[in-house]
Amino acid sequence: MLIQKNQCHITRTRENCDCTMNTVNEDLCLSASTLGSSSVTTQLVDPLDRKICLIRRQNDVKKRVIWGIEVAEKLHWKGWELGKETTRTLVLKNLSLKTQKMKYRPPKTKFFFTIIPQPIFLSPGITLTLPIVFRPLEAKEYTDQLWFEKEEGVFCVTLKATLPCYKLDCPSSLQLPMCALGDTVETWFCLNNVGDLPTFFTWEVPAPFQILPTTGLLEPGLGCKIKVTFEPLIAVIHEVEALCWYGKGNKQKNSINIQAAAKCAQLLVSIKHKGLEDQDQEGFQKVVHFGYVSVGSVAERQIRLYNPSAVNAPFKIEMAEHVLTKDPSFSCSTSQGIVPPGEKKCLSLFFHPKTLDSRAIDYFSIIPSGCATKTLLQVVGFCRGPDAVLQHSCVNFHWVKLGERREQTLWIENQSDCQAHFQFDIDCQESVFSIRPAFGTLAGKTRMTLHCAYQPTHPIISFRRVACLIHHQDPLFLDLIGTCHSDSIKPAILTPQHLTWYRTHLARGLTLYPPDILAAMLKEKKLERDEDGALILPIESLPMQELEDLPDQKYPNIPPMTEYFFDGTRDLAIFPPAVCLEPIDVDFGACPGPEAPNPVPLCLRNYTKGKITVVWTGRSDCPFWVTPVTSDVPPLKSIALRLYFQPSSPNCLYAVELEAFAVYKVLQCYSNIEEDCTVVPSWCLKVRARGHSYSPALEHHIPHYSLDSPQTFPAVSPGKPSYRSLFLVNKGSMLMTFSLAPNSSSDITLRPSSGLIGPGAHQVFLISTYPKGTSWRQHIFYLNFNFYPQYLKEVSMQSREEPLDLKLDTHKSIYFKPTWVGCSSTSNFTFHNPSRLPLQFEWRVSQEHQKVLAVQPSKGTIHPNENLTLTWIFSPLEEIKYLFRVGIWVWEARQSQKTKPQATVHYRIRLVGMGVTGCLSAKPVELDFGNVLVNSQEVKPLVLLNDGNCTLYYRLVLEQHRPKGLHSDPCALEFDHSEGTMPPHSQDTIYLTARPKVRSQYSWTISYCLLSQRAPPTNSMDGKKKALCHVSLAAAYPLLSVLDICSMGSTEGITRKHLWHLFSLDTLNSYLARDPTAKELTYKVPTRHSMSRTPPIFTPLKLDFNFGAAPHNALPSVVLLVLKNCGLVPLDWAFLFPSDQQLDLDLWVEQEDLNSNELHQMRAEDNSLFSINPKTGSLNPGQEQMVEFTYRHLFVGTDRLSVLFKVSHGREILLQFIGVTVKLEQKYVHFTSTIHQFIPVPIGDTLPPRQIYELYNGGSVPVTYEVQVSVLSKVQEKNFDHPIFCCLNPKGDIQPGTTARILWIFSPIEAKTYTVEVPIHIIGWNSAVVCFQGVGYDPCVMGDTAPFHSISSWDSSSISSRLMVPGQNVFLSQSHISLGNIPVQSKCSRLFFLNNISKNETIVFTWKPRSLDFGEVTVSPMEGEVGPEEGAPILVTLKASVHASFYSIDLICKVYQRELMRQYHKELQEWNEEKARQEVEFTITDRKVKRRAYCAAHEPPKKYKTLPPITNQPPLNRPATWNLKLAKKETSWPCPQPPVPGLLCLGLTARAHATDYYLANFFSEFPCHFLYRELPKKKSSKEESKSSEELPDKKGPVSRQKQQLLVDCLTSIIRGLLEDKNFHNAVDQNLVEQVPYFCQFWNEQSARFLAQKSSLYLVPILSLPPSYEGRKSKEQEEDLFGKMPGGQEDDEEEEEDEEEAEEEEEEIEEEMSKDEEDIDKDAKMTWSGIKVTETSQHSLQWQWQQDLKTIIKEETESDEKEAIGRLPAFANLQEAILENMIQNILVEASRGEVVLTSRPRIIALPPVSMHRTDNLLQMSQGDVLCSGMQHPDCLLVSASSPSNMTT
């Protein structure tokens, strides 16, 4: 391993003094990096530093502070030796501010010991050192403790000594940073050897994590840094466990939980500095345009990569594979990289074009790592070369005398931005024409002046066409003409017109004829002149077969490259040459001298039909010359010439171009010319000669040059030549020659092939080749410099024929998706141009298919390396399958559209489509908006489904079925879009917005029609609308109602029914059920809108909320209302005080003068007399909420406050809060109103019901009321002396805070309304006149509409709400029980549950007994306990009296916490004991006060003091519910008070009808009720008072005598059962016998039938005598009846019953003994009879007699049973048993033990085969089955009844 030094810092704290190794050097340890490198360098911690750290760890211990003492948690010994003592010190430091005293105990073992223990006193800040010595005797671990004792407690310090061991320390967990897929992150952590031995380690970690190094060796005290590398492949959270194995045998291990998250990286690609032609849209291919770039230069564009993810985004850039392109024009600066999270990175793209006038296209793929999609980037660039032009194409020097020199100027201009390198292909020194400068460089948009000179050496016509070679451009041509005259020779003067005629004659084949012949032919009419004056052959003179071979009459437009390469000097020429010279390139090689080299022969041929003269125009001092200088060549002849070379100086390079002019001999004299048009220019002959004078021993000077050579030839069509230009620059200071080496490829042509370049000069080459084959072909040629073989430059170029080829996608097949007839579908088709030529294409669709098939675009140009996407459009006309074959024609793109392409290629593709039909469907078909608030907005999604195979274009149509009277309103339903496109097997979501304006039921029908793309947009293909969906909506206003009301505090004495009327809740509910008016919707939601203290009211509805009356400073009157959203929409409600509606204004805006109402209102609000909690709320449909209204009795008098009750988007009701506060000791009776309405009563009712009128005493003293009944007699006299109104208790007392019930009987005799005003006097106070009204109706006329048929018409308690006080953990499952219409003397029971929702508190409940004026109500059990999260079943029973009456009862249940009750009983018991003790104590006066006081100081303090003398004081007659703030005399020792109970109220309502009346109106319901015949006796007033005063919480203790008596009785009973054999047999028989479930329901027929089947296997068992069974059943009935709650009697009657029962028991025992003897006799006779029957027929008569006795016995028993069944006692017993069974079932169902909704399961026994048909056996067996199956079930029900156990 490579070891480097690294410093680790040591960190200590007071709580933890261990050394933590945190490597901070360059963040290498426990720091993450995102390096992608896989190289690992393991760095170890400096051994010296590590050893120091470990020594400090041996000395430093972890300390703690206990009760102000700083001490170490433990002392650890390491590195000890056997038999040697090792001492460590324990430091105790006092950190508190007081002196600490402590003691310590020495260690228990003998291996640790310290100094003799002694007390330790530590002053503040003082440190004590306690030495502890360790002396080991064995090689094992030792553990002990050193204990310290203080006043606060004890603590210990652990002493531990361990053996040398292997131990490596590493972090338990390691969190690596997030990493992108394809990326790598790494983290370092420290692995320390904290053991005592050198340790080898080995790491194991699963993928994608790696740990390096995986193995190593650590010396003790050393640590190394481990690198963890994370390279994820899946984007998930990786969590692995790395294991480090070490120790002996690698059996020990450490684990590290390594966590790392892998995510997919994302890259957003955008174009920087986007241009007009760039495309940078999301979701589309991005296009970067470089524009026009000069050839040879480099253009740069940048793209921006943005990483929005939270991890690094590695990426790579791939360029499209170029199969056919060897020299790409585009490149990217970066092939791969990383973009940090949240950052941007710019990449450069370069365009360096090399092919002129071409459009380059390429593609780059930006591929992020992982699962992200790649971005395709298209780059486009145009190559633009130089555009050099000459001012003139011809320079005419006219005629010049021999020896003179003439000069003219012209300019050359570069019209492009690209730099232009030019060179004229002429040797100015050896030619009569010269151009200065002959080469140069033109910058973009520049011009240069050229000086052309003419200096002839012979009198001759001079004409030379000089090529101007330009790098990256076609050559330019300059015509130089001049004529030289001497004194003797004057040739014809050559003009530019002659050149024009010459070119025309050249095209017409007339240039091979001398002027004299042409003139003769013109005279002979063999030639003619055209409109331009040129000569032309007459057409009529030519035969017909030669007309086709007639050459072109005009000189063609020859491309510059073609003209340059095919100038006639090579084998190929455009026109036949007139004169030919060979060779044209002569290399003399080395000519060091002194001898001259041999001349080189030249051959000159004359192909004309005239004699020519050849003149060489070289200078005289030229080392190369030709002889003869002047010569004449006859027609069609050749001559031989000699080329000489004579170097002028040694070691030099020579290269020249010799020039000669050949002209017709006849033109040497202008007088020989008859026709000017026959003048022909001279022909320029050129010979390139080169050589050098270096000796072989000398090395030629080294050339310094640069050569710009391309790698490929431009793309051309097959059979066409390809041209390129090369650029050679001589960068040296000496001349440099070049020549094309002979071993170069023969299929290329290089011009010029040799030459000389001066220092700093350049040479432009043109090279051409004819590509052959579509594969790349390599051309290699060599340039030799300075005539030295080693100076050879190899140039390699490639060429190929560009085929007319396209790469078609989808394997030349296109499939259209199924298309709806009338619509169109599209399919994209992509093809690629792999060639380097732009191609033109054209799709040709047959005429018959053009209506069905189309393509866009149908024709166009595809550029090289371009991917072009076309769109095929398929529009079927029928529901059939279509098959097409379409061709595409491809040819090379030409600039001239008129030119017919020479070669075309065509491809055929196959297109398949299908025309289908389809339809739409909706989900759901029935869309219900549900309940929507009027004037609101509701949005619902509607899913459209296209299950077909084609795309559909649809339009939705809405038809509203408007409610009546709403036709003028706008449509209440809107679409977010009504038109769209649905792909096949897809769905689309349309959002419907409903805005109902009125409360009504809305319904719509949504239809659709399919659109056709062929038809106009307003029309549809299918004119029929098809129903899609039915939409319904119920527009509603918010509906709020009050369900329940409950009183607390000072209003506890008001009954619920009375309180219901005080708050006018019936009227309030009726108002809330109506629609709001327009004014009420002025402010739809509660808002501050008023500037005055009395806000304006927008509602006509006003109600009173009357809180009743209470004394001054009494408990607040609290009323709880349960609000329920009974409507269909959610709602918000609010109670707004006037201040809640007032705007917050500045003080100067408020009015100063306030009236009395405003002052009263301010007093009520400022003192919070009325409060509401909560004041606002929200309710969903069906949801309930409790609101608490509080009125505080702070001021005497009547308080009023107007509160606005606002339902958002609904009603507004003005509530008048009214509360009365009465002075103390003042009488006050609260009258709700002066009118009281009796419940309607039918006429002719002989027993009209009793009705109740309530009076509430709101004062603090009792009052006496008296109803003046004298006015009732007047009404009686007017109605035929019939008592219409009758008051049953006209006088009575009302206790403070309670309600008195005045009983009335309203008995109408006519169907009308009766009214009477009755004065009610409050004795000692005021009187009130109450108008009582009653309505009589005829039930025969009203029928089912009679008021008593609807219980809710007179009882508002028929609701099921759960009113819970905030913080209450106990509630009733039903707070109101309505029994409805019941008959008189009926017994009705209801089961409900008392639930405890607390999780840890047990509650104790007790019901307050309630006595009724008529009837009886009981609750069972009256008291009990309910555990946490449990419920107790409660049974409430109402026994109606004989009188028809109304029942409205409020039962109060007090709930206590069991712990508080236990604490109360405990304190009460202690108080009673102390009271008993103090009653017998007496006080002796001690005069020695000081001594007694001194002694008393040392006596233990007593818990209680002696009570003061007890005196009889009359208690105040005040209600227990009022906690008046009166001054009370403080007692020295108060009696413990019971805890404040929680109150639960159960409302019970019913209406009892007379039996005859009930049968007449509710006949079907009568069997559902049980009539309890025996009424309970009414208790005396004393017993009632005793029972009311008795505390239900107090239970008397059971005496020891009673307990012992109960134990003795049970013991004797159990022992008797254990010794009774009959009991054992009965138990065994019941265990063996299987009783089917259905056999419990027994009747006589089933018993007989069953006995017939089972007579073979059942023994005959005689039934008991009827008298015994009757007595037994009667006793059981009496016993059970006696246990019923209704069977309570006085003590005297109970004693008499006990005596009678004892006498009856004695009689029954005597009769039972007799009956048993009879039974034994009958059994014996039966057995003997059976035996006789088997042996003799004589006993058959006796058997018949027995059967007759049995039948008589059964009839007697049936009569007795029927008589018993009619007894009231039996009916009561039967009712009790059934009630108990049902109660047990319901209780078990509530506990989950029984599922009442499950299907019943009956298991029947298999049938038993019968062999005997004995009637006697059948009957007896039937009795046995009946008796054996009924009684156990009855006993089981009784035993399992919770009511029997509690009563």
UniProtKB/Swiss-Prot annotation:
Residues 1668-1721 are annotated as: Disordered. The keyword Transmembrane helix applies. InterPro entries: CFAP65, Ig-like_fold, Ig_CFAP65_10th. Its main location: membrane. Residues 1688-1720 have a biased composition (Acidic residues). Residues 805-914 form the MSP domain. PANTHER family: CILIA- AND FLAGELLA-ASSOCIATED PROTEIN 65. Belongs to the CFAP65 family. Interacts with CFAP47. This is Cilia- and flagella-associated protein 65. It comes from Mus musculus.
